[in-house]
C-alpha cells in the first residue's frame, strides 16, 4: 500500500449554516479521501469536545479555525507518512497526540475529520466501496431506517415534550421499498397537517414541527398518516420516539416535568408507567433516552420493566463510548446504543462501540446529527457493520436524502446478497414482542 503524503483541512458549512471541519487526505499513489464532520444541537454531557473558536465577531463564536489549524499543523505532522490502510494505528496516534480523555486539546472535530478522510482515501486506493473497505466481504445487511418526521422538545417551538417522532418501515422487503414507504407516509402526514391548518415547514432534520396540544397528538397523526399512505401501523410501519429525558429531568426535585406541554411532573416510577402506557396504546417499537443520562439505576429499572417489548436506546446515556456501554451492559441498562461518530471522535472507537454492543445482544443504530452535510459515510458504515438500523432524518432536505440515496446505491451494488431485516433487526426484543408490534 501507499503512504499518506498530505492532509489538508478547511472550514466549510453544515446544514444549519454553521462552520464545520472538512479534511482531505492524499496518498503517494493517487488515493484521495474527504471527510466532513457533523455536529449536534442537543449534546450529551459526556461527548467528545467539538473545538470552536469562541470569537464572537466571527460566526458568533462558532468558527472552527482552531480545529482546522490543528489538522494542518500537529495532526498532519504526526500522520503524514503512515500507511493509509493503518486506520487503527492512525486513530490511536491522534488520540495519543491529543492526550485528553475527551479530545479537548485538538478537538474531536479535527480528529474525526482526519479519521473519516483516511478511510475514504484507503478505499479509493484499493478501488473498493467504503462499506466494503470497512466491513469486508461480509457487509451485506441494509438498515431499517428511523425517519424523523415530527420534531418536538428542544428541536422545536411547539407544545410537545418528546424531541422526535419517527416512522420505521419494518414490513418492507428492501431498503428501496422502505424508503418509498417512508416517503409516502411523510407526504401523507404533510397532507393531513395541511388540511388541519397546521404548519408544514420543516426543521433541521427535515421533520415537521407544527403546534400540537400534547405528546399524544403527534402519535395520532402518525397512525393516520401510515393508514392514509395505505399501510398498517405496526405491521408495515412502526413508530419510534426520542424522549430526550435529560431535557425534562429536574435534578433538584428528582422529577420529570412535561415542561413544553401540560407542566405535569412525574417521579421516575410514574414516568416509566407513563411511557409504558404509550407503548401499550401505540405501535411504538423504540424509545430513545427514556431516562436522564446520569440516572444509571433508573435506566436498569426501566430496562427490566420494558426492555423485552420495546427497544430502549442510549444516546446521551452512552455517547458512543465503550466505557459507558460496558457499564450499561454490566448493569443491564438499555438494550440498544445510538452510534454517532462525532460523539467519540474516531472511526476505530466507533467500530469498537458497535462490536461491543452486538456481542452483548444490544442493537446499534448508526445515526446522523442535526447539523449534517453532504457526507454519506454513515450510510456505508451501517452496511459495513451489518448494524441493521439507521437514523438519518426525514424524507426532505438534501443533507438527509443523500444518505438514503447512498443506501439505495449500495443495495444495488449488493444485488443478490443484500439483506433487509426489517422487524428482525430488533434482535434485542423477544419474538413475542415483535409479533405484538405487528398486530397492534
From Swiss-Prot:
Pfam family, one: Enolase_N
GO cellular component entries: cell surface; extracellular region; phosphopyruvate hydratase complex
Residues involved in (2R)-2-phosphoglycerate binding: 163, 340, 369-370, 391
CDD domains listed in its UniProt record: enolase
InterPro entries according to UniProt: Enolase, Enolase-like_C_sf, Enolase-like_N, Enolase_C, Enolase_CS, Enolase_N
Primary location class: cytoplasm
Keyword annotations: Cytoplasm, Glycolysis, Lyase, Magnesium, Metal-binding, Secreted
Pathway(s) where this gene product acts: Carbohydrate degradation; glycolysis; pyruvate from D-glyceraldehyde 3-phosphate: step 4/5
Active site: 205 (proton donor), 340 (proton acceptor)
Keyword Secreted recorded: yes
Enzyme class: lyase
Keyword DNA-binding: no
Cofactors (names): Mg(2+)
Cofactor note: Binds a second Mg(2+) ion via substrate during catalysis.
Its EC number(s): 4.2.1.11
Annotated catalysed reactions: (2R)-2-phosphoglycerate = phosphoenolpyruvate + H2O
BP terms from Gene Ontology: glycolytic process
Molecular function, one GO term: magnesium ion binding
Cell compartment(s), UniProt: Cytoplasm; Secreted; Cell surface
PANTHER family per the UniProt record, alphabetical: ENOLASE (PTHR11902:SF1)
NCBIfam families the record matches: eno
Family: Belongs to the enolase family.
UniProt name for this protein: Enolase
Organism: Pediococcus pentosaceus (strain ATCC 25745 / CCUG 21536 / LMG 10740 / 183-1w)
Species classification: Bacteria, Bacillati, Bacillota, Bacilli, Lactobacillales
Gene, per the UniProt record: eno
Amino acid at each position: 500500500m501507499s503512504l499518506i503524503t498530505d492532509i489538508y483541512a478547511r472550514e466549510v458549512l453544515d446544514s444549519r449554516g454553521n462552520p464545520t471541519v472538512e479534511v482531505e487526505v492524499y496518498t503517494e499513489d493517487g488515493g484521495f479521501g474527504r471527510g466532513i464532520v457533523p455536529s449536534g444541537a442537543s449534546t450529551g454531557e459526556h461527548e467528545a469536545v467539538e473545538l470552536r473558536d469562541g470569537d464572537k465577531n466571527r460566526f458568533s463564536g462558532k468558527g472552527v479555525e482552531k480545529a482546522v489549524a490543528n489538522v494542518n499543523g500537529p495532526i498532519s505532522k504526526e500522520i503524514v507518512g503512515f500507511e493509509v490502510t493503518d486506520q487503527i494505528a492512525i486513530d490511536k496516534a491522534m488520540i495519543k497526540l491529543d492526550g485528553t480523555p475527551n479530545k479537548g486539546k485538538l478537538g474531536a472535530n479535527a480528529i474525526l475529520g482526519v479519521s473519516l478522510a483516511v478511510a475514504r482515501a484507503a478505499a479509493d486506493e484499493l478501488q473498493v466501496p467504503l462499506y466494503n473497505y470497512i466491513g469486508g466481504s461480509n457487509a451485506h445487511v441494509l438498515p431499517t431506517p428511523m425517519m424523523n418526521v415530527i420534531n418536538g422538545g428542544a428541536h422545536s417551538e411547539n407544545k410537545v415534550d418528546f424531541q422526535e417522532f419517527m416512522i420505521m418501515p419494518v414490513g418492507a422487503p428492501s431498503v428501496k421499498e422502505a424508503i418509498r414507504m417512508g416517503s409516502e407516509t411523510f407526504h401523507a402526514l404533510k397532507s393531513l397537517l395541511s388540511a388541519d391548518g397546521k404548519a408544514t415547514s420543516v426543521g433541521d432534520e427535515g421533520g415537521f414541527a407544527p403546534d400540537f396540544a400534547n405528546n399524544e397528538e403527534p402519535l395520532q397523526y402518525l397512525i393516520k398518516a401510515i393508514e392514509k399512505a395505505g399501510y398498517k401501523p405496526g405491521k408495515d410501519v412502526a413508530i419510534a420516539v426520542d424522549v430526550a429525558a435529560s431535557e425534562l429531568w429536574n435534578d433538584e426535585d428528582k422529577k420529570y416535568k412535561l415542561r413544553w406541554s401540560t407542566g405535569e411532573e412525574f417521579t421516575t416510577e410514574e414516568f416509566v408507567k407513563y411511557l409504558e402506557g404509550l407503548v401499550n396504546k401505540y405501535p411504538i417499537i423504540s424509545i430513545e433516552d427514556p431516562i436522564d443520562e446520569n440516572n444509571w439505576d433508573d435506566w436498569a429499572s426501566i430496562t427490566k420493566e420494558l426492555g423485552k417489548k420495546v427497544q430502549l436506546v442510549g444516546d446521551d446515556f452512552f455517547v458512543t463510548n465503550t466505557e459507558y456501554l460496558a457499564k450499561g451492559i454490566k448493569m443491564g441498562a438499555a438494550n440498544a446504543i445510538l452510534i454517532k461518530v462525532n460523539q467519540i471522535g474516531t472511526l476505530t472507537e466507533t467500530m469498537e462501540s458497535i462490536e461491543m454492543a452486538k456481542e452483548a445482544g444490544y442493537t446499534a443504530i448508526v445515526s446522523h446529527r442535526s447539523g449534517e452535510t453532504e457526507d454519506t459515510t454513515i450510510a456505508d458504515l451501517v452496511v459495513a457493520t451489518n448494524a441493521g438500523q439507521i437514523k438519518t432524518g426525514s424524507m426532505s432536505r438534501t443533507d438527509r436524502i443523500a444518505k438514503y440515496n447512498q443506501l439505495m446505491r449500495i443495495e444495488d451494488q449488493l444485488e443478490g446478497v443484500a439483506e433487509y431485516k426489517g422487524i428482525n433487526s430488533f434482535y434485542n426484543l423477544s419474538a413475542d414482542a415483535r409479533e405484538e408490534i405487528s398486530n397492534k
